[in-house]
A protein has these predicted regions:
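Core segments of alpha-helical transmembrane spans in multipass integral membrane proteins
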Residues: 1-16, 31-32, 104, 140-165
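Short juxtamembrane and helix-loop transition motifs at transmembrane-helix boundaries
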Residues: 14-24, 132-143, 165-174
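Membrane-helix boundary connector in multi-pass membrane proteins
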Residues: 38-55
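Cytosolic juxtamembrane helix and N-cap/initiation of the first transmembrane helix
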Residues: 77-108
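Transmembrane alpha-helix/helix-exit interface in multi-pass inner-membrane proteins
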Residues: 105-125
Length: 176
């Protein structure tokens, strides 16, 4: 919920500030939503409650992609994209090391959660959950839950990588 709330806030920023130059928010969200759509379909199981997310996630993804393409013409959402140059563009070395560490950990977490959610669940070693544990909400998450969290975390990882690669200047919507 918290990860999705952050994406909601980024969308509210676009609505409040205007879409000019907000490719730095929208492209990572699109990538995360595409991965989420794939993981929802790949890992959906019999224990997952409703079939609705299997259809809503891809529909939401298509709507978000359509909004991006509509904003390209109207509000110059791609403003600044052509000036994006990859490189390590943070001058403060301790900050650069910290951000690189966050990016590496984010890539690892996202990759493991999306590609091998079952292994991530087994890594906690919960074993078999008793009915009392399940009633208390202490059971293991489903594979789709772990994979979706990895796809949401991917958005934040890409945002952080963009700050490292392009520098922090003008990235206040991403950093907040």
């Amino acid at each position: 919920g918290v990860l999705m709330f952050g994406i909601f806030l980024s969308t509210m920023l676009i609505l409040n500030e205007g879409a000019k130059g907000m490719w730095k928010i929208m492209i990572p969200v699109i990538l995360g939503f595409v991965v989420m759509s794939a993981t929802v379909w790949a890992y959906w199981g019999d224990l997952d409650s409703s079939e609705t997310p299997k259809y809503i996630v891809p529909i939401t993804t298509v709507i978000y992609i359509a909004a991006y393409f509509l904003l390209r013409a109207e509000d110059e959402v791609d403003d600044g994209l052509s000036e994006f140059r990859m490189g390590l563009n943070i001058e403060d070395k301790p900050s650069l090391v910290a951000m690189l560490l966050v990016v590496v950990m984010g890539i690892w977490y996202s990759f493991m959660s999306v590609v091998m959610p079952g292994d991530r669940i087994e890594a906690f070693g919960l074993g078999e959950a008793s009915p009392e544990m399940l009633d208390a909400g202490l059971g293991a998450p489903s594979e789709v839950t772990v994979a979706v969290s990895g796809s949401l975390f991917l958005v934040y990882t890409i945002w952080t990588a963009m700050v490292v690669l392009d520098g922090p200047k003008g990235k206040w919507p991403v950093l907040h």
